[in-house]
């Protein structure tokens, strides 16, 4: 395939040739001898030519934090609907989080999710989770992308773990050379007074303002500092999920961790 007149992110307008599944060449004016043959007979074996007409050409995006909710909550989303939506938005690889039902915290649960993921139309990976009764022996026998989110406070799926369990999980991940993705909130710093507000306070029916008031910025920053401290002490590869405050990002950077941010945390 030859893609012509495509704009790259640096402003250059180029042609790009794809051979099989790899980019073969990028240049200002690649050979367009196949244009006429392709136009005359689109079903021929000759090279297909696509005129990008000056539109941006980007590589497929990788979304390393998705919740496709299958198995267990397929009324919300499935691997088919989630990956079709991702593909429509230019996302070609996704990594799914473990707070499904059952949680992806055992080898059998991983296998069940892997079976559901066969409906995916793009590339994917699966993370493993930590619960009070997880089975690390069977879980780490599977091809995990990472361990986590490991929840330092309860959230969707009620998979919050105590500090001792978190530290034990990090130790095991280090032994297995697996990255630990952390949902970083210190629930001792949640603002209990927000529970007295309208619209449910902090539960599933809460409005956005009260939810944010309850799960405070200080709770995130403190948990990031704790997680990165554990990471430094164990030489773990720590990744902080969905940082939502400048303080949380600063704590991740200062602590030697990587972190991610959601578009709605930037723009809403």
Where are these predicted regions, by residue range?
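Histidine-rich, glycine-flanked metal-binding segment
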Residues: 1-59
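Divalent metal-coordination and catalytic microenvironments
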Residues: 6, 21, 54, 65, ...
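Metal-associated gating/positioning segment near the N- to mid-region
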Residues: 53-119
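Short, acidic/polar
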Residues: 75-83, 131-142
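Short catalytic-loop micro-motif centered on adjacent basic/acidic residues
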Residues: 95-96, 125-127, 236-242
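A glycine-rich helix N-cap at a beta->alpha junction
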Residues: 115-130
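Histidine/acidic residue-rich metal-binding segments in metalloenzymes
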Residues: 134, 138-150, 155-268
């Amino acid at each position: 395939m030859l893609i012509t007149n495509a704009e790259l992110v640096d402003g250059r307008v180029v042609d790009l040739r794809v051979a099989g599944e790899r980019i073969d060449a990028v240049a200002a004016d690649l050979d367009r001898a196949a244009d006429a043959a392709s136009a005359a007979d689109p079903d021929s074996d000759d090279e297909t030519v696509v005129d990008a007409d000056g539109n941006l050409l980007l590589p497929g995006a990788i979304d390393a934090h998705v919740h496709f909710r299958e198995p267990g909550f397929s009324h919300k989303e499935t691997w088919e609907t989630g990956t079709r939506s991702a593909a429509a938005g230019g996302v070609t690889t996704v990594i799914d989080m473990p707070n499904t039902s059952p949680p992806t915290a055992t080898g059998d649960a991983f296998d069940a999710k892997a079976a559901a993921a066969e409906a995916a139309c793009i590339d994917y990976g699966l993370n493993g989770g930590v619960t009070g009764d997880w089975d690390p022996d069977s879980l780490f026998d599977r091809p995990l992308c990472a361990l986590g989110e490991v929840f330092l406070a309860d959230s969707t799926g009620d998979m919050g773990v105590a500090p001792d369990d978190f530290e034990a999980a990090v130790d095991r991940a280090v032994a297995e050379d697996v990255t630990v993705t952390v949902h970083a909130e210190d629930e001792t710093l949640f603002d209990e007074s927000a529970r007295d507000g309208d619209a449910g306070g902090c539960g599933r029916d809460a409005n956005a303002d009260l939810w944010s008031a309850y799960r405070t910025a200080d709770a995130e920053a403190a948990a990031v500092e704790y997680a990165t401290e554990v990471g430094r002490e164990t030489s773990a590869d720590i990744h902080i999920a969905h940082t939502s405050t400048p303080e949380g990002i600063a704590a991740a950077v200062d602590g030697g961790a990587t972190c991610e941010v959601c578009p709605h945390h930037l723009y809403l």
